[in-house]
Amino acid sequence: ILASNDYTAIPFTVTETAAVKAGYPMTLAGKKAVAAGETGSKTINADGILLYDVDPAENPNASLLIRGVIDTKKAAASSSFTYDADAIKALKTAVPGIFCRDNISVNA
């Protein structure tokens, strides 16, 4: 999901009952973030983006991306989270250190 080698991630624990795929926005409580609101004014309760796939039944330890550049096409394909314009705008407000790109032909 990364589009750059320069990023910051913090350790945290996934508390979901099922596996969560890389690229999904997460809360510090270890839950999947939820986007809410009307088109054009959505908000999201995200604190970062899950850096790697995590199955909490096997090992709940994870890395939460809090600063860096992500390839939204890769993140969406991995996580099934919808990275539309409203979600990206809400994510940038919630986690200002995350930059979303989708026009990347070669990743670092």
Regions flagged by a language model, labelled:
Residues 1-108:
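Surface-exposed, low-hydrophobicity beta-strand/loop segments enriched in small/polar/acidic residues
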